[in-house]
Amino acid sequence: MKNKLLLMIFMALFVSQSSANAQSISYPCSIVLEPVNEIPNISGTALITKIKKPYTDQPGSPARERTGVGVYADWMPMPSAFGDFDQYEGFAQIPSEISWRIKMYVVKEDQPSWFGGSPWVGKFDEISAELSAETIVSLRLSNSRTNRLGPAVLQSTLKGCVK
């Protein structure tokens, strides 16, 4: 009886560890951010990678590992086309745990696309939490005056990043 119980506990731990490893993210990883609604031409991508950041600016400073998320979106209409919004924000979240807002910047082009819209870029590289396949990365509307975050216009999960 005791041996059966130990065997069952060992098997449960092995299966639990195997499923946890099966869901680990392979870095670096890029995902395509898909339009949430039918908005012509918009497209985006996110690059998720591990980076080493020094603790200080001093030479030889020890480094700490963080996860960085970079977001690129193109052919984006002005945010005001969707209502009371004046910017886009990248947004990464582990559902029901934690989220990060990513400041986005419009890229001024020398020769804008005749399709319209503008590219927006941003990155955040201070994530210490372990990301999972269920992590959602999106580009959302935002109002800088009220700090109100609007709905997502592009979105995807990290499921395509699983080893």
What are these regions (language model features)?
Residues 1-7:
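Bacterial N-terminal signal peptides that target proteins for export
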Residues 20-163:
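N-terminal targeting/export leaders
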Residues 8-16:
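Bacterial N-terminal signal peptides
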